[in-house]
Amino acid sequence: MEKKLTLLLLVVVVLFVNLTNATVRVQICPRESAKDYILGFRDKSALHRPGFVTEGDDRWLQMAADMVDKKNKCDYAALLFYASWCPFSRLVRPSFDLMSLLYSSVPHFAIEESSVKASTLSKYGVHGFPTIILMNSTMLVVYRGSRTLDSLVAFYTDVTGIETMDERWVERNRLVPHFHAEPENCPFPWARRSPENLLRQETYLTLATVFVLLRLLHLISPTMVVFVKFTWGRVSNMRLGNPLEHTVTMYLKEPCMSSNLQEGAMNARAWASKSLATVSIAESSSSSRSVSASQ
């Protein structure tokens, strides 16, 4: 009988311990994998930490696209494309952080201009900085309004259909010093991108551009050589001078020489007229003599 009671007590203790462990296991969060630990969240569809904005690059953009895929629970993702050299980007970043508080169910990603390729910016329709985009599995919506809190909240609500938190909280945080009422943008920074970044980020595009430029130079080089030779010949002729052009120039520059030439021409004409008159008189006298002799 005592053995049965002992066995029964052991069974009760074992069952109690198992139930306690099961309860503890239910209350403890599951262990994160190494990938989840590195990425900073367990579920791709949940970035619910208030004010959490992920700094990303091309890989994070691909992850954001995967998060809003139809197979996942996340409906929308917010993207901020900014540039560190752009003052308007520094003004809009605090407002973007605040929007991640208001819409904590929407993952927010901040993408710096130098961390992505130019083709990626073109893909997302980024033509200036800063640019705020809301995207889902079927569309990208670019925000083009002012940067006041009311305007941003209206944009988020219209696109996502998600209502904000307490209106009184929004009212208290409406006048944030970093907000700017006008939608200024820094132009697309092609000139600001260093050749090193272009070569590293757009290797194929850079090599293709260099090839096209070299090919164009090869095609126009014969024409350029002919043009240079022709120009050099003209310059040499202008320096040495043509004898005929030199004579004409001297003739125009020296009036004495021109007057002497004019006098010589007049004397030649007078001499020629006198010679013709003498010849005509001689012929007339000889003809009159022959007529008288015949009579």
From Swiss-Prot:
Asked if the record carries the keyword Magnesium, the reply is no
Membrane-protein topology: Single-pass membrane protein
One Gene Ontology cellular component annotation? membrane
Q: Which Gene3D superfamilies does the entry link to?
A: Glutaredoxin
Q: Transmembrane segments in this chain: where?
A: 208-228
The cross-references to InterPro entries, in alphabetical order and at most eight, read: APRL4/6 (IPR044606), Thioredoxin-like_sf (IPR036249), Thioredoxin_domain (IPR013766)
Which cysteines pair up through disulfides? They are: none
Carbohydrate-modified residues: N136
Assign the protein's first listed, main location to one coarse class: membrane
Keywords from the named record: Glycoprotein, Membrane, Signal, Transmembrane, Transmembrane helix
Source domain of life is Eukaryota
Places the protein is found: Membrane
Boundaries of each Thioredoxin domain copy?
23-161
**PANTHER family on file:** 5'-ADENYLYLSULFATE REDUCTASE-LIKE 4-RELATED
The molecule here is called: 5'-adenylylsulfate reductase-like 6
Lineage here is: Eukaryota, Viridiplantae, Streptophyta, Embryophyta, Tracheophyta
Gene this chain is encoded by: APRL6
